[in-house]
Amino acid sequence: MSLQLFNTLTRKKEEFTPLKEKQIGMYVCGVTVYDYCHVGHARAAIVFDTFYRYFQYLGYEVRFVRNFTDIDDKIINRANEEGIDWQEVNRKYIAAFYEDMGKLNIAAPTVEPKATDHIQEMFDMIQSLIDQDKAYESDGDVFYSIKSFKEYGCLSGKNIDDLQAGARVEVNESKRDPLDFALWKKSKPPFWESPWGPGRPGWHIECSAMSKKYLGDTFDIHGGGKDLVFPHHENEIAQSCGCTGKQPVRYWVHNGFVNIDKEKMSKSLGNFFTIREVCKKYHPEVLRLFLISSHYRSPIDFSEKNLEDATKVLSRFYEGLAGAREKTANLNKESIPNFQEKVKNHPLTQKFETAMNDDLNTAVAMAHMNEELRNLNTAVLGKGGASLEDIAVATRAWEEAGKILGLFFLTPEEFEKELFEIKNQERNLDVSKIEELIAGRKSARQAKNWAEADRCRDELTQMGVLIEDTPNGTDWKLK
């Protein structure tokens, strides 16, 4: 099955065919750097990171551009609130952004342009639109003329007559039409000198100018959250088509919302959790797994229960991985004939690719990984007749599927250690006390002092410690 993507522009799944063979140009709208990123931002970052990883897995050379909006009224307001320079606000929250992305194992894009480094490109684009009578200057502002673009509404499906009827309540005397939007806004400091007077760029022109510079007049994929379809991406199409006469993007891809109590998580509604808040209580990889457990276009419900469930799933994944690696530790995988070919033809690899080729259906892909984990655990226990070679091939197929999803970037031991540290922050348990009780239970069992063994076990249970007796001793972890 060839790769199929749902194109917001055509409202259907389409076979993905890039402009250039084995090359992909992808632009994703980044964050406005005035605050810490929330879980909604995490979802967008993880979704398009997974696209990036899967395209590379398929053998594409990907030029991935993700921008920073580093000039905006919100940034200036935050600078005033904190009593610092607006550029210091940028530095602070860009650094925080990179910290958050690192925790979530987000791969670095090819290019990460900042809006303020591309003012000249915006000037050039705005002037081109003015020269073609598709934009006009009005008292220091420059507006895009909606009437100059007959296809306005093609992405969102909105009717321009309905929009105009709704826009008449907010009259701006500077505009020829209430729907016209700003390309350049006259402003107080900070501002840039321009042919139209001092001011700042409009939000929409920033992305059009940067995507054009780094990916050309037309490129393969433009991504972002569903909330950007209108007006941001609709306006990008209008600007870019107006400037070049070409549709700027072949496939528009949008991820669904993260919801809390059936409402979109957002700063404007005040119902958001920052990535760093969540990662104090849950492992960052748990958050990543949770956010890819649903199809990227579907809404996903954020709740403690869902994160607890994701923790259990990821712990089970790492436990299975540890067992399989231990089972094949002494096997030289390189000596297995056609090892990589066998991995490529393994049933998990085939099912995983089929799911991912169906509009990047990570939910189904993870269901296949769950199924294969059960098979792998059975094989590790010596049941089912699987050879060590079979286990090694299945393990590698499973690892590669996880890598595409951005999972398993730690060893099982590292994951368990970090998970314990996160869970123990609130409980502040004494590890030496836990080890002492486990040793005491072991001694009591050897002496057949069952009452004492039960007492040690009960005390561990009260502490929230789960124990498991294995041939190699007693393993433990926190609930």
Give the role of each language-model region.
Residues F68-D72, I94-F97, A107-M122, G140-F149:
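Short, glycine/charge-rich beta-strand/loop segments that flank catalytic centers
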Residues E82-E88, P109, R297-D301:
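Short, polar/flexible loop-turn hinges at active-site or ligand-entry regions and domain interfaces
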